[in-house]
């Protein structure tokens, strides 16, 4: 049972009702998440206002966002996000085999180029998004724990950025990085509050053997 009870529409401030209604229209399956965040008017206004803006206006392919989100959500073991984003990823055209691959690739070792080599079944841009998501997790969580020298992390970061800059615009890079790192925050938020999936959402358990 969730530690915070999601609010109802009648419980939010009048100036949040229009945002609430848009969340209900665009993200009905995430109701427990945004209705919980509504305990803070600041959080729901800025976080969900931003997510709605990104959905409307971002030049980043929705498939790329879903790839990054699934990679990090499996590693951080967020059942809520995995359960919600697995069908969304499939809805962008990813195959079941590709989605299953994303459940395992986050735990692979980073090589000298910050990659795991070829990502079977994914094109060049998609593979680069996988490498970005993996690097964010590795640099922020695993490298410090493993005692990897900061200079090594710095060099790998620069190589990865050069690859990103060759394929994506500065705006796309910023929005990819922001949305991926933001997903980690969502993962930890949901875990800490023991957020329950909505009744209509099929629970997809993350792969506990990886990450």
Go through each PLM region and give its residues.
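Hydrophobic alpha-helical segments
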Residues: 1-211
């Amino acid at each position: 049972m969730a530690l915070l009870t999601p609010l109802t529409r009648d419980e939010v401030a009048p100036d949040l009702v229009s945002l609430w209604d848009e969340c209900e229209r665009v993200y009905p399956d995430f109701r427990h998440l945004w209705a919980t965040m509504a305990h803070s008017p600041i959080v729901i206004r800025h976080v969900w206002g931003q997510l709605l803006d990104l959905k409307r206006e971002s030049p980043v392919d929705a498939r790329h966002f879903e790839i990054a989100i699934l990679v990090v959500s499996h590693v951080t073991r967020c059942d809520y996000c995995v359960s919600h984003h697995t069908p969304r990823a499939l809805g962008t055209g990813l195959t079941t085999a590709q989605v299953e691959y994303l459940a395992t690739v986050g735990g692979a070792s980073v090589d000298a180029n910050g990659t795991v080599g070829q990502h079977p079944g994914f094109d060049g841009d998609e593979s680069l998004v996988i490498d970005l998501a993996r690097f964010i997790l590795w640099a922020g969580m695993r490298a410090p724990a493993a005692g990897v020298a900061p200079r090594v992390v710095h060099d790998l970061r620069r190589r990865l950025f050069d690859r990103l800059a060759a394929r994506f615009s500065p705006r796309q890079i910023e929005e990819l990085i922001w949305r991926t790192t933001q997903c980690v925050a969502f993962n930890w938020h949901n875990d800490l509050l023991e957020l329950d999936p909505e009744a209509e959402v099929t629970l997809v358990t993350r792969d506990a053997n990886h990450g």
